[in-house]
């Protein structure tokens, strides 16, 4: 696409955060002329809060974004300054990669990836209004009264819609420190048929690294070998790896906080929005867990060249003088200096129950919402929604069928189903525990689950498609090879198994079945004399091992998925008036009319909808079928 001035686009994306960048890139990748509008081009892809990508459940989303051709995994591979696998001693379903990020490098790498998208134009301007005609979005209006027109719009405004920052009892309008909130657009959106509420998030003070005493603090190094996020990535992509440090709050810290709760906007009623349950402020921790003697604080570098340390664990909106007292009471931070105060930010979000599973608004055709505007918290949750919204905005612009993953296909499927079915009364964060199919939704198989779909949708380029097919072939060939290699009871390899792993063979066994034993890994097969490693790709080797070890469990889970798919594939029309279906309880009628589920499966996951309600719906659908087809 020519980068010259244009007014007409296929897709317009509002907001250059994690949701917006993925949305813009996805739309451009599938061939749509795309415009990304952002208040500050320099802040595209910025890590507003913690300088890290991944974590429990979140890393699965990053892997899925990558399998769908997205940006986040590739950007963090080139920006991560410490990589670790969390839950490494647990089963593969809950193992989660986490990377400490260099803030500057991460932004730079996101911008580099966006520059490669030939169908994408980026413009620095603020949007003040949507142009809507007959409940169809047709464009946007900027603060300078410039109009841009499109067939689809993605709204990914983060914390900027009506954003308000709180430090102590003082507050001011802002979407992020040093950046103005989007007030005109927030007011305009409240005039549209959306259900709007407020949420809150927060961030800790930043500390000058040169004023910290690291002696006697616990040092936390990254993993060796260093993990990689992208299926196209390599360890050689990583910059210099550096450690983090661990310290703790103490009784003195807690007493300072208790004495100053009357200065907290959280406890004086100034902040109305609900904060994230799984990332509470230090004030919340002290109030909610009064018996705890200490709380962890991870001292995380913000980059290789940055002098700022992010003290993960003490998010706060107390006044600056109190923040200084809190920090100075902590071991290693006695003489430290705060560079930037912590703060809380309140912002508008829209009820995600008003969205289809494609993230298109039920009320405004062509309008897609992604990220914190949908009630989520976290970069990874935002980015995955952005990719899906951008893809479907592009498909809508092309008059093509839209796509979304099911719960059994991806954590992204779990995320959007939870949001559109349950809504968000508090900021939604992804965990592996949210999925009932987590054994088949592992980090390591995200590409096997999604890349073929992505290729058919136009999201994946040829190099990735070739790499994917090579991996699939290598896994298949190696499994067949392992099946043919046998170990006999009186062989030298049988003796080795007995000596190293206390395994006594009474009959012959092939290597594939040997891998089912918990003590045997693909890596330690190298101790066998008659075995040679047949695959150099460690990721593919791990895939083989996981599939073999958990074969029985995976088989049962797949059978369960097939049983549930019958209900998932039984549609419910959005035009149904549930008042007219006999036998439904008053509560069921209210909830079904409110949520408008798209399938019987989705209806079954609405809080308060009982198995009896589902039976009544199925009977009604059966009667309706016979009425329409046999009359």
Swiss-Prot record:
GO molecular function term, any single one: flavin adenine dinucleotide binding
Entry keyword annotation includes rRNA processing: no
Residues given in the record as NAD(+) binding sites: 275-289
InterPro entries reported for this sequence: FAD/NAD-bd_sf (IPR036188), GIDA_C_N (IPR049312), MnmG (IPR004416), MnmG-rel (IPR002218), MnmG-rel_CS (IPR020595), MnmG_C (IPR026904), MnmG_C_subdom (IPR047001), MnmG_C_subdom_sf (IPR044920)
Superkingdom, natural source: Bacteria
Record GO cellular component, one term: cytosol
Location(s) in or outside the cell: Cytoplasm
Pfam family, one: SAM_GIDA_C
GO terms for biological process, alphabetical: tRNA methylation; tRNA wobble uridine modification
Cofactor(s) named in the record: FAD
Binding positions (FAD): 15-20, 127, 182, 372
Keyword terms: Cytoplasm, FAD, Flavoprotein, NAD, tRNA processing
Function: NAD-binding protein involved in the addition of a carboxymethylaminomethyl (cmnm) group at the wobble position (U34) of certain tRNAs, forming tRNA-cmnm(5)s(2)U34.
UniProt similarity note: Belongs to the MnmG family.
Assembly, per entry: Homodimer. Heterotetramer of two MnmE and two MnmG subunits.
Protein name per UniProt: tRNA uridine 5-carboxymethylaminomethyl modification enzyme MnmG
Organism field: Buchnera aphidicola subsp. Schizaphis graminum (strain Sg)
Encoding gene (name): mnmG
